[in-house]
């Protein structure tokens, strides 16, 4: 399971700055979900190949009233959701009563935490550590979040405390043995294709899970984890193995009440990261709302294959259906590669077709193509539409190879690749998608420059070359002297 890290502390100690730096600001952020995650933002972050979910919270002072009280409650909830806590304090302001209160709360909850002394600009780190030592949280790690100072040391400490899964250990073993570390995930014999059913509350996720499992389902086990873990439900259909990653909690047939289904952002984000394919469920009667876009954006940034299911399609008038389809085209243009199904989970209409799209999306996400195939597609694309000129020189793209899967990562080598415009990258992405007939999965393209490895370096001559150079110079001097003497 993907670990969850919460940033907590008083207001204005630099939590949001730290959040933006660790998520690199370009990663998907799922936050500001009204009534559920006010002043909690969720981001997908990766450090040294290790992925985790980061939670940014509002400040805690201990004397909140009104809206501030609600914000503080959300921060305390984030602590409960997290596997690990980064407790930020302000090195300039020194230790406060609010800092001590938060430290006491973390001790009571028995939470694993690291004390982070932020804003150490022009402050002696040893002085900062001594200032906060009375709180009993161990030695503070000094950082300057706005400048990035100390972040590497902080993350080294954090990663040392986070659990490692089998995939991380296998990757480390490959690196230790000198193998190329490219993850190409596939369905294990035990799990099959892992499918996450995600969506807002009350869109019919529970009903869809049970409808897809069916009356004749083969469930090996229902194994609930901790209160933060999802439920993994292995089953078979037509000889194919699947595993549902269900975020709606334990349920029994006939006892599902959609109106009380609990929604957990953390469960959903963890399910997305752990899945091969995401089935994104929407309520056709409500159309596309901002919450849908937030969650769908996170699935896209995580690189997961996506299938969209528009539930509660039955009973809608033709005019309503036409309007919803228009809205889908307008607002979901960024996932136009995903299959869309119009279903009724309650009555089973169209549900069976989801499996075909799941298999197609998974196949597209994990298929391995040889370098020769990817390079030929690149050459054909460049021949049809050349890259632009940069300072009078044409960008050259030489060859391409597969760098990873789920999502497919195509690595393209060439020169001046840092100057390739986004429009040309989209052209290449669309070309690969069309030629390889990819459906249901995003594609990522990464460029590698072809810098001259000898640029700026002097050649070191061998002894033989030095002697030869001396002989040539001596011969040249003698010949020059003879020409002068003849004159």
Swiss-Prot record:
Coiled coil ranges: none
Gene Ontology MF, one: ribosome binding
Binding residue positions for GTP 1: 9-16, 56-60, 118-121
Keyword GTP-binding included in the entry's annotation: yes
Region (Disordered): 449-487
Start-end of Basic residues biased regions: 467-487
Amino-acid biosynthesis found in the keyword field: no
Binding site for GTP 2: 199-206, 246-250, 311-314
Domain KH-like residue range list: 367-451
InterPro entries: G_ENGA (IPR031166), GTP-bd (IPR006073), GTPase_Der (IPR016484), KH_dom-like (IPR032859), KH_dom-like_a/b (IPR015946), P-loop_NTPase (IPR027417), Small_GTP-bd (IPR005225)
Domain EngA-type G residues, every copy: 3-166, 193-366
Keywords: GTP-binding, Nucleotide-binding, Repeat, Ribosome biogenesis
The organism's place on the tree of life at top rank: Bacteria
Biological processes per GO annotation: ribosome biogenesis
Stretches with biased composition (Basic and acidic residues): 449-461
Protein family membership: Belongs to the TRAFAC class TrmE-Era-EngA-EngB-Septin-like GTPase superfamily. EngA (Der) GTPase family.
Subunit details: Associates with the 50S ribosomal subunit.
Cited function: GTPase that plays an essential role in the late steps of ribosome biogenesis.
The protein's name in its UniProt record: GTPase Der
Upper lineage: Bacteria, Pseudomonadati, Pseudomonadota, Gammaproteobacteria, Pseudomonadales
Gene encoding the protein: der
